[in-house]
Amino acid sequence: MSLRYESIESLSQMIQNKTIRPSELIEDTFVNIEKDDTVINSFLALDKEAALEKAKTMDNETPSGKLFGIPMGIKDNIVTKDVETTCASKILEGFNSVYDATVMNKLNAENGILVGKLNMDEFAMGGSTENSFYKKTVNPFDHKAVPGGSSGGSAAAVAASLVPFSLGSDTGGSIRQPASYCGVVGMKPTYGRVSRFGLVAFASSLDQIGPITRNVKDNATVLEVISGLDPHDSTSAPVDNVDFTSQIDKDIKGLRVAVPKEYLGEGVSEEVKASVQAAIKALEKMGATVEEVSLPNSKYGVATYYILSSSEASANLARFDGIRYGYQAEGAQNLEELYKKTRQEGFGDEVKRRIMLGTYALSSGYYDAYYKKAQKVRTLIKQDFERVFENYDIIVGPTAPTTAFDIGAQINDPLTMYANDILTIPINLAGLPSMSIPCGESNGRPIGLQLIGKPFDEKTLYNVAYNYEQIFNMHERYQSL
């Protein structure tokens, strides 16, 4: 009996009822990974021995915790004490953290079992997972297509039913865009909802960790586990933990839905428009009221994001110098040369591009023209959302302007690649919660519906997503892959 297509809820019930043992589930997981991941390439490292040992110990224990015996994959920019963390970069090859990230501690406290670390764009910079130093991940729905990025391995592993859930990180769309491309459920929580302690920083004012699953309720369960105030993270918000799964199925009659006209305009493919408009009509049939609104400053989102995120990245990545950990270049004659050679050889092209862009934006004479101006535009984008949320409960639109593109099609065209995140970036700039759920397909490649909520109102997003999932879900499609 293959357990790969079962939900977290179903697997937990089976373990509780002693229909299966945790060790059987973990053994089945590794059988599937070893059989299928030679093609998908979602995992960078596996922790088979430790996972099986932990599962066998659990066989003799009374089930406790929301994730007892459940296998999980973690994006490789979230540090794990016992498994290498590389951020898919040569410069961190062989790096082993001396501690677990807060989210890992929370997952372990609920008795989840880590099976491995997942591929990504190097240092989370990219939208296709082609920027990984180690391997290229493919889209389980179409092996010629990218899985999205930067959390491409996290989305692909879940879509291929190798694990029931994974964690990704989202700085400008890096959970939601791959979730859209791979036909899975991806949540970027409100900034501060989930601790970033142990997440290797890209852009600290934008980064947020979130779950990727095959159904909405599983996603809510995982967010419940990883949420909460953390004294190790000064940006962690002092808000009460929420039971996201309770009343997840309540009806949405009277829900006020806003649809930004900019999100269905130029650049959005006809197939994506049609699927998203059909999903919006479905919400209307369920009793929601839908009105068009405007988010006029969203068009400046991509430019604003690349100035701010690259500026923060140039500072955050200064610590990788070949001295303390990771890759160290050979043949340097002095300290300055060691720094230069290590960073030149250790970082990939996209990371270098963003470091240079960020350093330029922060440099004397350009700071006011670029960085300071971008901060002002960020405020305007945030105010646009605040105005809309005075009268509406949720904003709905596409997650990405198109379906997944072919591997190799955009890797040499950074501006086109950057534009793929035009619909997700503004939400990070505003610090809001947002999720992608499947709403259609075009030529076998999935289309995602993006739901955007008020600060710390992930519960409403899950409620709407769950109701929509009852009329459109991908369960049978996962089994056909």
From Swiss-Prot:
Which Enzyme Commission number(s) are on file for it?
6.3.5.7
* InterPro entries cross-referenced by the UniProt entry: Amidase, Amidase_CS, Amidase_dom, AS_sf, GatA
Q: Name one GO biological process term.
A: translation
Its GO CC terms? glutamyl-tRNA(Gln) amidotransferase complex
Task: Output one GO MF annotation.
Answer: ATP binding
Q: Which residues form the active site?
A: 75 (charge relay system), 150 (charge relay system), 174 (acyl-ester intermediate)
Keyword Protein biosynthesis attributed: yes
Catalytic activity of the protein: L-glutamyl-tRNA(Gln) + L-glutamine + ATP + H2O = L-glutaminyl-tRNA(Gln) + L-glutamate + ADP + phosphate + H(+)
Q: What class of enzyme is it?
A: ligase
Q: Which residues form a coiled coil?
A: none
Q: What's one Pfam family here? A: Amidase
Keywords assigned by UniProt?
ATP-binding, Ligase, Nucleotide-binding, Protein biosynthesis
By sequence similarity, the record places it as follows: Belongs to the amidase family. GatA subfamily.
The record's function comment reads: Allows the formation of correctly charged Gln-tRNA(Gln) through the transamidation of misacylated Glu-tRNA(Gln) in organisms which lack glutaminyl-tRNA synthetase. The reaction takes place in the presence of glutamine and ATP through an activated gamma-phospho-Glu-tRNA(Gln).
**Assembly and interactions?**
Heterotrimer of A, B and C subunits.
Report what the protein is called: Glutamyl-tRNA(Gln) amidotransferase subunit A
Q: Which organism is it from?
A: Macrococcus caseolyticus (strain JCSC5402) (Macrococcoides caseolyticum)
The gene behind this protein is: gatA
